[in-house]
Swiss-Prot record:
Stated family: Belongs to the beta-defensin family.
Top-rank lineage group of the source organism: Eukaryota
GO biological process, one term: innate immune response
Native source organism of the sequence: Gorilla gorilla gorilla
Major site of localization recorded for this protein: secreted
Keyword annotations of the record: Antibiotic, Antimicrobial, Defensin, Disulfide bond, Secreted, Signal
Location of this chain's protein in the cell: Secreted
Function according to Swiss-Prot or TrEMBL: Has antibacterial activity.
Transmembrane segments: none
Protein name, per record: Beta-defensin 107A
Pfam families referenced in this protein's UniProt entry, alphabetically: Defensin_beta_2
Disulphide bridges, residue numbers: 37-51, 41-60
Cellular component aspect of the GO annotation: extracellular region
Length: 66
């Protein structure tokens, strides 16, 4: 019975690691698009994608003036 809890804990930790790796990858893509990850974009910024991190779900970039 104890082995079940150890296996469950290991699977839970692996799932957390893979989510973190994906969030880091999306943050790098956001930086490549010259944006930054924030919880909410400011009024003068445009949402250009998603970072999908828990605390910073949006990729924001300054709007271009025409």
């Amino acid at each position: 019975m104890k082995i079940f809890f150890f296996i469950f804990a290991a699977l839970f930790l692996l799932a957390q690691i893979f989510q973190a790796r994906t969030a880091i990858h999306r943050a790098l893509i956001c930086k490549r698009m010259e944006g930054h990850c924030e919880a909410e974009c400011l009024t003068f910024e445009a949402k250009i994608g998603g970072c999908r991190a828990e605390l910073a779900p949006f990729c924001c970039k300054n709007r271009k003036k025409h």
